[in-house]
Amino acid sequence: SPAFAKQDGTLHIEKDNPKIITLEKAVANALLKNPTLSAHSLEKRVREARTLQSGLLPNPRLEVNVDDALGSGPFNGFDRSETTVQVGQLIELGGKRGARENANRIAERVADKTYESKRLDILTDVNKAFVEVLSSQNKVKLTEELIELGDKFFNAVGERVKAGKVAPIEQTKAGVTLSTFKIEMAHAKLELKQARRKLSSTWGNAEPQFVSVTGNFFKIYPVPLLESLQNKGVETPYLERWKSEQERRQAMVDLE
């Protein structure tokens, strides 16, 4: 929360308004609460556990057999019974364990790149939805100003009609224009409502808990160098996921 000093020297901390969200807050909500992203995060942990398990030796088998425990006479009970204990350990030959571990490690990398790809998709969706809300808010605001101007113009024309300076048809035209602005306002408010729902759905809320968003349409960021863009294009998680998926399929063939 932002803080500033009062004139008396005390520090005042301004609390964030939960009803007004920024792009940063919207992104944080989506990364923390998006159900699809959470599912991919769980898949990552499952793959990590499988990779760890595949690197371990299979659990040994323990068998205990008791013979002649149900005899008769002097052989009744466990006094004359024979107990056999067998311990078995599976030993995999032909590099099977190493191949299985490699396949699981590659599958873990696929899950990791899938998560990164989905994370980028969510970030893109949040940014687009946020811009739609901000744009819809501005449209509502501009339409409100048009209605205010149209109302003033309608009243002004009415006064001129009363004074006999213009024909009554002019006030009728002004009324039609004002009605058109009001219809546009209804459409703008509906678009804003839909945009707010779309944004809140990126973090799993069917109905938005916020009232408005705040941001700057006209903030200009420096253009990155072409070399850095080329490197990022090669290192995208989408391409890396595709490569890892090819390796995973080959590893599964080797495992068979």
Model-derived segments and spans:
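Short beta->alpha connector loops
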Residues: 44-46, 67-70, 247
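A glycine-/polar-enriched beta->alpha junction
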Residues: 28-38, 45-59, 74-77, 85-103, ...
